[in-house]
Amino acid sequence: MSLIDPRAIIDPSATLAPDVRVGPWTLIGPHVHIGEGTEIGPHVIVRGPTWIGRHNRIFQFSTIGEDTPDLKYKGEPTRLVIGDHNVIREGVTIHRGTVQDRSETTIGDHNLIMAYVHIGHDSVMGSHCILVNNASLAGHVHVGDWAILSGYTLIHQHCQIGAHSFVGMGSGVSKDVPAFVTVLGSPAQARSMNFEGMRRRGFSPEAMNALRRAYKVVYRQGLTVEQALVELEESAKQFPEVAIFRDSVRASTRGITR
């Protein structure tokens, strides 16, 4: 028995692994690759050029690899690349890149992207991230591994959301969020470190205490960013986690969320 519903429309140039499942009334366009073990539900649209890896599950009414509405986009053949073991729930929209940036939108592995999330053009998402219902990323956003974006969060274009960070429900983020930091509000403000996430992932008490001290250096001592980075140097040599935090602060291009 075919794993592709006869009511689905598959472009002849699309390449699907033999065990890919495709539901009814789904449209898969030209220049799409779908890897083994992936399941595409009913009423899904996948446009190319798009590369979807192995063992992903995409639910109904999602639109994957659509042209960006960015007014600079003039129909160039940009790409979307999705890794392995991702779950993309109902009504998600993910746009391809633009030639003004990387020409590619990239999603890593083992991400949970819940209903009605939007991921804009040229965004880069790491692995093991969770985006809760109706979170929206504008174009050119970078999201680090293990980040969690709660429901109805809005991320401004070109923002960096650091690894292991947590963005609270309904937050409006217009500046960069350093690694491990919890932010909340609209406009978002830094509240603490994401210690609950660290505990769940097995971080040592020593590393969490070092990050607690590092947070105070950046956010509680009235230092400039440059001064705080100098203060973090010794701790960063002892704890790789502090080095990750320091590097994310240093890499900020929009200024960090305070």
Curated annotation (Swiss-Prot):
GO MF: acyl-[acyl-carrier-protein]-UDP-N-acetylglucosamine O-acyltransferase activity
One Gene Ontology term, aspect cellular component: membrane
Catalytic activity as recorded in UniProt: a (3R)-hydroxyacyl-[ACP] + UDP-N-acetyl-alpha-D-glucosamine = a UDP-3-O-[(3R)-3-hydroxyacyl]-N-acetyl-alpha-D-glucosamine + holo-[ACP]
GO biological process annotation, one example: lipid A biosynthetic process
Gene3D superfamilies given in the database record: Hexapeptide repeat proteins (2.160.10.10), Udp N-acetylglucosamine O-acyltransferase, C-terminal domain (1.20.1180.10)
Keyword Lipid biosynthesis: yes
Top-rank lineage group of the source organism: Bacteria
Subcellular location, principal: cytoplasm
InterPro entries on file: Acetyltransf_C, Acetyltransf_C_sf, Hexapep, Hexapep_transf_CS, Lipid_A_LpxA, Trimer_LpxA-like_sf
Stretch forming the signal peptide: none
EC number: 2.3.1.129
Keywords, in A-Z order: Acyltransferase, Cytoplasm, Lipid A biosynthesis, Lipid biosynthesis, Lipid metabolism, Repeat, Transferase
Subunit structure comment from the entry: Homotrimer.
Function description: Involved in the biosynthesis of lipid A, a phosphorylated glycolipid that anchors the lipopolysaccharide to the outer membrane of the cell.
The protein's name in its UniProt record: Acyl-[acyl-carrier-protein]--UDP-N-acetylglucosamine O-acyltransferase
Organism for this UniProt entry: Azotobacter vinelandii (strain DJ / ATCC BAA-1303)
